[in-house]
């Protein structure tokens, strides 16, 4: 695959992920809390959470997602996946990785639902550097 084709492919994948995040915006309560305890992160409010997620997605070059488990009930959704990507170096606050690292992020998202809206999203994460930059 040429460099141009690879860039186009990566851009399409990122656009699809960004469009997905924007489409799911209304599933969040206006006062939703997003937390990643392992990184000491907390984001509050629907617009801030979506902006935060878009910024994180934009920092993942050539993301490859593997979906591991999904379960939902009226009150909770559990979404477990792994994503491998080259870290752009900005956009994932307090990430234990450096710019240019090829990493695998395993994330379990626990979404608490009330009245059909996500009111709390907790992300349990495990970061692994598969190949350090340089």
What is each PLM-predicted segment?
Residues 31-44, 56:
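A short gly/proline-enriched turn/hairpin at secondary-structure junctions
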Residues 18, 28-34, 72-76:
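Short acidic/polar alpha-helix capping motifs at helix-coil junctions
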Residues 11, 28-29, 42, 106-111, ...:
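Secondary-structure boundary/capping motif
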Residues 1-30:
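Short acidic-aromatic low-complexity motifs
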Residues 19, 48, 123:
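Residue-level recognition of oxygen-bearing side chains
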Residues 12-13, 38, 100:
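Generic anion/oxyanion-binding catalytic loop in active/binding sites
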Residues 2-3, 51-134:
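A beta-strand edge to alpha-helix "cap/lid" segment located at domain peripheries
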């Amino acid at each position: 695959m040429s460099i141009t084709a690879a860039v186009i492919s990566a851009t399409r994948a990122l656009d699809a992920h960004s469009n997905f995040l924007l489409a799911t915006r209304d599933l969040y309560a206006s006062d939703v809390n997003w937390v990643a305890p392992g990184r000491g992160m907390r984001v509050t409010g629907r617009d801030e959470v979506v902006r935060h997620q878009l910024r994180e997605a934009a920092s993942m070059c050539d993301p490859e997602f593997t979906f591991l488990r999904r379960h939902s009930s009226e009150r909770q959704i559990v979404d477990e996946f792994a994503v491998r990507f080259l870290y752009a170096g900005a956009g994932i606050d307090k990430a234990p990785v450096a710019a240019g690292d090829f990493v695998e992020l395993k994330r379990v998202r626990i979404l608490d639902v009330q009245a059909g809206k996500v009111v709390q999203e907790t992300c349990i994460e495990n970061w692994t550097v598969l190949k350090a930059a340089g």
